Regions:
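A short acidic, Gly/Pro-enriched loop at the edge of an enzyme's catalytic core
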Residues: 87-94
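SAM-dependent methyltransferase
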Residues: 107, 128-190
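A short glycine-rich, Lys/Arg-flanked "PGG" loop and its adjoining helix->strand segment in the class I
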Residues: 111-123
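Residues lining the SAM
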Residues: 98-100
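Conserved class I S-adenosyl-L-methionine
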Residues: 1-45
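C-terminal lobe and adjacent flexible extensions of AdoMet/dcAdoMet transferase-like proteins
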Residues: 190, 194-219
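Class I SAM-dependent methyltransferase SAM/SAH-binding core
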Residues: 46-85
């Protein structure tokens, strides 16, 4: 039942994310940007979102700090790099920062990632960010659910003010993976402040839960 294999630097199991189907993320991004818009996918992982965006007609540059993750990316230009220090000397119609990377507990890392978004987005482009939905994150509890063929079980939940840690247990095709993580909840004002520090401004939300934020270069 157990599964091992490679893990990304943040602990994400490579085999799992290479097999896990995308949810509604690609549709949310696609609806927020023009047809054929170029996308810089920061923290692309194994390409769950990138592959769907490519199929929808978007040229994608996939950036990740795990070579094992990037091995699974198909159809995109691939860049092995740390988001914080990324410098491609190019601009994109859309810069995507998904997977709740904004909720990292280190404020310096968060600022560096948003700065990377700002220096790679076109003047008339947008930054699309996925964060933990403020309302849901405050009430999250341990429990299990399914999505497609995969099952998820959130366990070992510990809250310390705005910061919480937990372990996610994934099961798919008879295999099981565990991923322990820590995250910091950000409300709208804190998100806006982080964006402003990077020279960005919020341009709206892309879903009812406010988990998806659209930002533009501040003028």
């Amino acid at each position: 039942m157990g599964a091992s294999g490679h893990h990304a630097p943040d602990g994400s199991p490579v085999e799992l994310y290479a097999r896990l189907a995308a949810g509604d993320e690609p549709a949310i991004v696609h609806a927020a940007i023009p047809a054929g818009a170029t996308v810089l996918d920061l923290g692309s992982g194994a390409g769950r979102i990138a592959h769907a965006l490519i199929a929808l007609g978007h040229p994608v540059v996939a950036v990740d700090n795990s070579p094992e993750m990037l091995e699974h990316v198909r159809g995109a230009e691939k860049v092995l790099a740390d988001i914080r220090t990324l410098e491609l000397h190019r601009r994109f119609d859309c810069v995507l920062l998904a997977s709740n990377l904004l909720n990292c507990v280190d404020a310096t890392t968060r600022a560096a990632m948003l700065a990377a978004c700002a220096r790679h987005v076109a003047a008339d482009g947008c930054v699309v960010i996925q964060r933990l939905a403020p309302g849901r994150a405050l009430t999250i509890e341990e429990g299990a659910w399914t999505r497609g063929q995969a099952s998820f079980h959130l366990t070992s939940l510990i809250r310390r003010g705005r910061i919480f840690s937990a372990t996610m247990v994934f099961e798919l095709d008879g295999k099981r993976w565990r991923h322990s993580f820590e995250a910091e909840l950000l409300d709208d004002e804190e998100t806006d402040a982080a964006l402003a520090h990077a020279g960005l401004r919020r341009d709206g939300f892309l879903d009812e839960s406010r988990a998806w934020v659209k930002a533009r270069v501040a003028v």
